[in-house]
C-alpha cells in the first residue's frame, strides 16, 4: 500500500470502532434452547433479558451475543428460511444515525425494525443474505444499549466468572457468498465504509477450492473475509445449500491463552474440526523457531502459522459446525495479523475429510479428475 492509498484508507466514513454484537436465532423453542446451551459451553453467561422482547444477552469478555426469539420479527423471518442461524451483527461507530445515513447514501438498503415503548432506535441496514447490520454508538464511556433495553440479572458478573473460558473479543467473522458475489460484497463494504482488501486467497484442497477476499475497516478492528466457491462441491457450496442462501460462515474469537481456552472447551464437550497427524510432523520446519509446545499443539489439535522472525505467529482452531453450517474459530495472535494462510490447505482438506465421511464428497480419483477438468474449462 503506497502513501496515498494508506492515507485514503484512514478515512473512516462510518466511524467504525469494532464489533458490538452478533445476533442469533432459531425457528423454535428447541433451537433457541440449543443456542443458549451452546453459548454457555463456549464460556458465555446469560447476563440480561430484554425488557419487552424475547431476547437474551450472553457475554464473555468484550463479546456480546444476542439470542432473538421475538415473534413477528426479522429474526423470526430469518429463522423460518435459514433455520438456526446468525441473523445480524452490529458495528460500534461514532454516530449511529450518521453511519446509517451514509451507508444508505452509498446504496445500502435501510432496515426498519419494530421499536417498543421507551426502547432505543438502533439504526440498521440490510447486510449479507438479508441479515441486519446495525450501528451502535452507545458503548464504553457513553454507556450501553443494554442498559436501556435489557434488565441485567443481579448475579450477572458471578455468572460470567463461573463459565468464562478466556475469550476476549471478536477477532473477525466471515461471509459465504454465491459464486460471482465475492466481489459484490467486498465492493459493498468498500463503498459504505471504506473497507480495504488486506488479503486475497485462492485455496485448493485435494478435491475442491475456494476464493476469499479479506476486507478490513479503517479502524482495523473489523475484519471480514468474504468467500466464494471455485466449484460445486466445496464446503462453501454445501453451506449455501444447507443455509439456503448467503450469510455469516464463522465467528472468530480471540483468546490470550488458547491452550487454556481449548482445554476448557473440550472438557465441556466442544467438538473441533480434525487436523491430520501429518500436519504436526511439518510444524517445526514450516514455522521455524516458533517456541510453542509441539506436544500440546498436537494434543489439542491447534494450528500454527506465521514466522517468528518476520511477522510473528498465530494459533487457531475451528469448532465443528454447531449452528446449522455455522462454526466458530478460536485464535490467539502473537504478532501475526493474518488469517492462518499457511493453515488453509490443511484446514480445507480436513473439512473435505469430514465431507467425505458424510457422503457429500466421494473421495475417489474420478472426483478429483473431474474437478481438474472442470477447472481447466473455466
Predicted features, each with a name:
Residues 1-31, 86-89, 145-186, 244-253, ...:
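N-terminal beta-strand motif that seeds the catalytic metal site of vicinal oxygen chelate
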Residues 127, 309, 321-322:
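Short, acidic, Ser/Thr-enriched surface-loop or helix-capping motifs
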Residues 18-25, 39, 44, 58, ...:
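Short, structured motif recognition centered on aromatic/hydrophobic residues
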Residues 175-223:
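Beta-propeller domains
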Residues 324-341:
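Extracellular low-complexity, Gly/Ser/Thr-rich intrinsically disordered linkers
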Amino acid at each position: 500500500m503506497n502513501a496515498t492509498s494508506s492515507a485514503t484508507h484512514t478515512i473512516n466514513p462510518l466511524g467504525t470502532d469494532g464489533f458490538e454484537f452478533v445476533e442469533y436465532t432459531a425457528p423454535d423453542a428447541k433451537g433457541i434452547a440449543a443456542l443458549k446451551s451452546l453459548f454457555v459451553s463456549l464460556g458465555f453467561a446469560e447476563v440480561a433479558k430484554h425488557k419487552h422482547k424475547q431476547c437474551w444477552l450472553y457475554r464473555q469478555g468484550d463479546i456480546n451475543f444476542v439470542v432473538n426469539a421475538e415473534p413477528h420479527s426479522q429474526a423470526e423471518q430469518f429463522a423460518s428460511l435459514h433455520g438456526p442461524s446468525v441473523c445480524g451483527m452490529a458495528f460500534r461507530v461514532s454516530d449511529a444515525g450518521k453511519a446509517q445515513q451514509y451507508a444508505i447514501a452509498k446504496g445500502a438498503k435501510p432496515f426498519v425494525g419494530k421499536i417498543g415503548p421507551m426502547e432505543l432506535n438502533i439504526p440498521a441496514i440490510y447486510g449479507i443474505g438479508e441479515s441486519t447490520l446495525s450501528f451502535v454508538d452507545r458503548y464504553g464511556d457513553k454507556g450501553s444499549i443494554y442498559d436501556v433495553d435489557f434488565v441485567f440479572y443481579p448475579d450477572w458478573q458471578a455468572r460470567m466468572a463461573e463459565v468464562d473460558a478466556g475469550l476476549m473479543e471478536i477477532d473477525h467473522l466471515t461471509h459465504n457468498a454465491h459464486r460471482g458475489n465475492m466481489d459484490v460484497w467486498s465492493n459493498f463494504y468498500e463503498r459504505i465504509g471504506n473497507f480495504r482488501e488486506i488479503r486475497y486467497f485462492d485455496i485448493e484442497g485435494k478435491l475442491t477450492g475456494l476464493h476469499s477476499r479479506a476486507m478490513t475497516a479503517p479502524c482495523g478492528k473489523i475484519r471480514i473475509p468474504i468467500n466464494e466457491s471455485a466449484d460445486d462441491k466445496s464446503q462453501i457450496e454445501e453451506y449455501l445449500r444447507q443455509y439456503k442462501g448467503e450469510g455469516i460462515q464463522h465467528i472468530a474469537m480471540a483468546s490470550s491463552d488458547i491452550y487454556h481456552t481449548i482445554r476448557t472447551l473440550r472438557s465441556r464437550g466442544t467438538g473441533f474440526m480434525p487436523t491430520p497427524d501429518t500436519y504436526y510432523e511439518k510444524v517445526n520446519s514450516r514455522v521455524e523457531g516458533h517456541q510453542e509446545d509441539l506436544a500440546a499443539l498436537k494434543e489439542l489439535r491447534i494450528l500454527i502459522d506465521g514466522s517468528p522472525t518476520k511477522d510473528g505467529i498465530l494459533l487457531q482452531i475451528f469448532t465443528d459446525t454447531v449452528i446449522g453450517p455455522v462454526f466458530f474459530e478460536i485464535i490467539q495472535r502473537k504478532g501475526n495479523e493474518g488469517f492462518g494462510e499457511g493453515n488453509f490447505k490443511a484446514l480445507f482438506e480436513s473439512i473435505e475429510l469430514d465431507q467425505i465421511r458424510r457422503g457429500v464428497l466421494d473421495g475417489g480419483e474420478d472426483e478429483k479428475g473431474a474437478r481438474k477438468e472442470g477447472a481447466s474449462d473455466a
